[in-house]
């Protein structure tokens, strides 16, 4: 699968996973990233997904995916069992994002975490001038019908990383699906991808 067929954050992650790596994709959906990593990088991929229909779709692609919840089921994975643990656009749906990231860093040597940036200027504009929760391309659901229970910003995420003593090995910011600079990323980036180490 080419980068063009992947969501921009997934394409960025795929380009940065080393060939032959052992990878756990948490919140893997239908396994789009897993299939790309398996086919293009020869990665040994596993997945954890809460939605049974998406688990079935991923298994139908020949992928090793189990149904489970990131908030509770990561405890069953042994320490250092993967080179990378990936959490893409799932952080904001977890009950305790800090505990989930801590589990990822226990399970994997490094963790990729991507999320929509709630502090992007369009969201701020919507709140400031419209007085309403933003609905954007990356946050498409109305406030009362969304899986998102935490709205994270780039600066908040960096603060969480700092507070827990984790290390940022890489950070990328996306706007309109394209990489953008880190200057004022909290204001101008729609999406963030971090590579962390415990």
Summary of predicted features, one role per range:
Residues 4-20:
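Conserved alpha-helix/loop element of class I SAM-dependent methyltransferases that forms part
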Residues 19, 80-81, 107:
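Alpha-helix C-terminal capping/helix-to-coil transition sites in glycosyltransferase folds
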Residues 27-29:
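Class I SAM-dependent methyltransferase "Motif I" SAM/SAH-binding loop
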Residues 32, 36-73:
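Class I SAM-dependent methyltransferase SAM/SAH-binding core
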Residues 73-79:
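Short conserved loop adjoining the S-adenosyl-L-methionine
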Residues 84-96:
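A short SAM/SAH-binding and catalytic strip from SAM-dependent methyltransferases
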Residues 98-103, 110-198:
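S-adenosyl-L-methionine-dependent methyltransferase catalytic module, highlighting the catalytic core
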